[in-house]
Amino acid sequence: MPIDAWVREEVEIPEGVEVTVENNVVKVKGPKGELERELKYPGVKIFTEDGKVVVYKEFPRKKDIAIARTFKAHINNMIKGVTEGFTYKLKVVYSHFPVTVKVQGDEVIIENFLGEKNPRRAKILPGVTVKVRGQEITVEGIDKEKVGQTAANIEQATRITKWDRRVFQDGIYIVEKAGKPIKF
């Protein structure tokens, strides 16, 4: 049963950012680059007016309100990405075998992990840059989902199964997500 007559979520467009909406495809241009994303859901309208992006739905149900707020969050992340960008930081941890990490093309190569002869590989998604400085890895880009997925790929490449993780703590771990430190 609808409670409200409509849901209207607004996102301010900052200076230096250009947002266009055509057929539920939102394009955001800013100083760091350009992002494009299709935000499609039945009955949800997205348009720009008075320097704002508006997500609108008439006679919403609970799920419609959730979708409108999700679209608002996606648009906020796109705007933040093209203005500031996103950065994830990872730390290489090892106790006995020194791990070597290097970037080669669109892959991160992890050598000598737990003394293994074959290197482990993690995929770098397009539009994301990875820098390795000693025991710190920095993942940067304008698309929050691609940056987060690349950091997760690197972390998962060194995941240890069959051994007690409390004892064998070797690996690569995310220590900072999009500027916020991780609490362990």
From Swiss-Prot:
Q: Name one cellular component (GO) term.
A: cytosolic large ribosomal subunit
Question: Listed GO molecular functions?
Answer: rRNA binding; structural constituent of ribosome
Name this polypeptide is given: Large ribosomal subunit protein uL6
State a single Pfam family of this protein: Ribosomal_L6
Indicate the quaternary assembly: Part of the 50S ribosomal subunit.
- Keywords (A to Z) from UniProt: Ribonucleoprotein, Ribosomal protein, RNA-binding, rRNA-binding
Similarity comment text for this entry: Belongs to the universal ribosomal protein uL6 family.
Keyword Nucleotide-binding in record? no
What the protein does comes down to:
This protein binds to the 23S rRNA, and is important in its secondary structure. It is located near the subunit interface in the base of the L7/L12 stalk, and near the tRNA binding site of the peptidyltransferase center.
The answer to whether UniProt assigns keyword Ribosomal protein to this entry is yes
Q: HAMAP family under this entry? A: Ribosomal_uL6_A
User: What is one process in the GO biological process aspect for this record?
Assistant: cytoplasmic translation
- What are the disulfide bonds? none
InterPro entries recorded for this chain? Ribosomal_uL6-like (IPR000702), Ribosomal_uL6-like_a/b-dom_sf (IPR036789), Ribosomal_uL6_a/b-dom (IPR020040), Ribosomal_uL6_arc (IPR019907), Ribosomal_uL6_CS2 (IPR002359)
Instruction: Enumerate the PROSITE patterns for this protein.
Output: RIBOSOMAL_L6_2
Give the superkingdom in one word: Archaea
Question: NCBIfam families, from UniProt?
Answer: PRK05518.1, uL6_arch
